[in-house]
Amino acid sequence: MKRALFIGVVCLLAGFRTASAQDFPESCPDECTSIAVGRLATTDGSVFTSHTCDGVSHSWVSIEKAADHPRGAMTPIYKGTRKNFFRGDTTGVKIVGEVPQVAHTYAYLNTGYPSLNEKQVAIGETTFSGPDTLRNYGSMFVVEELCRLALERCDNARDAVILMGSLGEKYGYADGGECLTVADKNEVWFFEILGCGRGKKGAVWAAQRVPDGEVAVSANIPRIGRLRRGDPDFLCSDNVESVARTYNLWDGEGEFIFWKAFNAAYGNGRNFREREWFIFNTLAPSLQLSFDAPELPFSVKPDTLVDLRTLNAILRSTYEGTFLDMTQNWKMTVPAKNGKPEQTLVSPLANPWLTTDMRNTLNTIAPGTIEFRRTVAVCWCSYSTVIQLRSWLPDAVGGICWLAYDNPGQSPRFPIFAGGTSLPSAFDFCGHKKYVPDCALWLFRRANRLATVAWQTDKKIMMPKVLELEDEALNAVSALEPDAQPAELDALTARLFQHAADEWKVLEETFWAKHGRGF
């Protein structure tokens, strides 16, 4: 009993110091999960892509306006914009080249990874790194700049994929392996890209269309398998196999499989881990996919059609109630009292978002208490998006970025429209480099962190509020007229955002009152 009580005390301290990206325990990318859904897999014909931007990508958000450009104009290409403090902050930003400008660029939502344009083209992202020998740091394009140009120039997903691939090939790709889930109001694609070697300008890439009736997941492991050249639902660069052979990533004899050739250590030789398996099994339990399988399919048909609420719930997931649940062994003994017998229960202090140090402390006290699992929702998330694209509505109203700040397992979502033109001032600054009380990230982060002090009880206060705000936002969006003007869209975004922020201020005060005498 003493050991159980002591673990409870440590858990109490654990609740306040939750995990950060720096505490991530494995030599693998810690950033991002994306779920993509075809139009025939949804309840109303929407196409979805999504993105949990896990890490310290900037939390400021702006809407970049459409523009016309003179013949012969060039556009600069940047590095260093993803972690600056505000729009226009040039600290650490470099111009590394330029490419010819087009006559007209579309308006787009400028998130850490640009995410939605006025034509209902949307992008989610996850990092899979791949073999470091392929990375050419001196090349021109990082992935966020590919996203920017695709959204500025393209009115459909296929063209966006082709543009990004061609830019990487022509000017060089500088990042590690990335997957972009590129969607429009009719279809969604997986686009996976890497460099082609140290000191070599170019890129290796492949893209596969998600079947209209299916769902696909990217979570830091490449997911594209066999190359299907000539298939209209598949695209790739010409050099895929030759680069793999040059760097001994494929022997040239067996069947070439993209994810096997370009996987990193995080995949452990497979094309999935916890997140992919959990999401597929949540959406298609009838398939009975095994966690011990050598690989999972690229996409699955869900047993039940998917909607926004479905995706919001999955992005909140920490595997609660499953064998992957990290809180299942956090026990606390409650002494017999008032005729009730002694009980051993999951501690009310147990939460799934601990630091490595706290996890190690608990496992030193009682070995085997916590087996680390990379959850879908993490507290080191900067922001997350669920982007809904609707072909039957005008683009301005049909495209919606449902944005949440901080931990998607705790925070509410509010809509930003493809036709929006302005955002509240709380979006102007990033909350990572310093504490900015009035920036959007911290308006939600404060209550979220306090809630983890006693998560098993605090979530019963917080989660009903998340669902209440979800209902309010969905009802407000459904009441919009198809011809709603930008001012009306902006006003709705501002109202729903402010209401959510106000409710999180009340929660912050509630949790201080509840826990203020000590953690």
Region spans (language model):
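Glycine-rich, aromatic-lined ligand/substrate-binding cores of catalytic
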Residues: 242-392, 396-397
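Histidine-centered catalytic/metal-binding microenvironments
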Residues: 463-519
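Positively charged n-region of N-terminal signal peptides that target proteins for export
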Residues: 1-4
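Sec/Tat signal peptide C-region and signal peptidase I cleavage site
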Residues: 16-21
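Bacterial N-terminal signal peptides
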Residues: 7-15
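A contiguous strand-loop segment
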Residues: 23-142, 163-166, 170-312
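Substrate-recognition/cap regions that form aromatic- and gly/pro-loop-enriched pockets
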Residues: 348-479
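Second-shell loop/turn segments in exported
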Residues: 133-137, 145-154
